[in-house]
């Protein structure tokens, strides 16, 4: 077991079940307890927004868990700027819902890892695709699937300017463990569908019917595979 200092964050909030599952993963991988800096409420879809014109409040839950009024990217900035400056890796998630293809540009989960990369810290964004009509998400199973993947990715040499994006599929409770597929992000844009009601426009696109390129992360995860994609910033 390594002695890496792992920083954990998410966009679903400090009390989210997915973040608790990610703590399980971190505790299996490193002998050092992880540091958690996460939003005090849900910031899903926050993208890479950061706070520079107003104050951020930080609530210390204990000596290694902090909740903040900031966005996911703010959480990483706060950590590296004072709460946990000696971080080795940034892990974000496990997001409730997929962050596949074009989602990486809107996801607060992915933005947190991207912010770490900008400051020279390697990272892994982790998400769990959610499909209607299937058994509830099993976060203990998600942690079990994710642990060997994160351990493997952390053991590899890091190329500055890159990060890993991992998506878990939503399969039935009785299904066999999914295969792991290394693949590219799907470049297809999300659907441009809106419904007009009383002068207001409501997004009406169906995430589960989104366009997809065969063999891409969207295609593979929707078919039941764990997808691992290397994302390059520069």
Indicate where each model-derived feature is located.
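Short acidic, Gly/Ser-rich segments with clustered Asp/Glu that frequently serve as metal-coordination loops
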Residues: 12-20, 211
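Short beta-strand segments
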Residues: 9, 37-39, 92-95, 125-127, ...
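Electrostatically charged, flexible surface regions
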Residues: 137-234
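A cross-family phosphate/adenosyl-ligand binding-site feature
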Residues: 2-6, 20-86
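Glycine-rich phosphate/pyrophosphate-binding loops
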Residues: 117-141
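Alpha-helix C-terminal capping segments
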Residues: 79-84, 111-122
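Short glycine-rich anion-binding loops that position phosphate/pyrophosphate groups of nucleotides
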Residues: 12, 42, 71-72, 95-98, ...
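Glycine/threonine-rich flexible loop motifs
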Residues: 98-107
């Amino acid at each position: 077991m390594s002695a890496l200092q792992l920083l954990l964050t998410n966009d679903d909030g400090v009390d989210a079940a997915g973040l608790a599952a990610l703590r399980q993963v971190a505790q299996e991988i490193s002998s050092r307890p992880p540091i958690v800096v996460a939003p005090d409420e849900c910031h899903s879809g926050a993208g890479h927004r950061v706070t520079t014109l107003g104050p951020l409040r930080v609530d210390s839950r204990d000596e290694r868990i902090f909740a903040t009024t900031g966005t996911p990217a703010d959480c990483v900035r706060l950590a590296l700027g004072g709460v946990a400056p000696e971080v080795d890796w940034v892990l974000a998630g496990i997001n409730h819902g997929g962050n596949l293809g074009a989602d990486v540009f809107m996801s607060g989960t992915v933005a947190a890892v991207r912010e770490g990369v900008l400051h020279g810290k390697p990272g892994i964004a982790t998400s769990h695709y959610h499909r209607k009509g299937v058994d509830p998400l099993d976060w203990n199973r998600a942690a079990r699937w994710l642990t060997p993947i994160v351990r493997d990715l952390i053991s590899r040499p890091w190329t500055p300017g890159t990060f890993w994006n991992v998506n878990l599929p939503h399969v039935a409770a009785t299904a066999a463990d999914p295969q792991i597929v290394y693949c590219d992000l799907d470049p297809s844009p999300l659907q441009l569908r809106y419904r007009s009601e009383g002068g207001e426009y409501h997004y009406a696109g169906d995430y589960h019917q989104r366009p997809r390129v065969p063999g891409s992360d969207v295609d593979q995860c929707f078919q039941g595979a764990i997808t691992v994609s290397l994302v390059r910033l520069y």
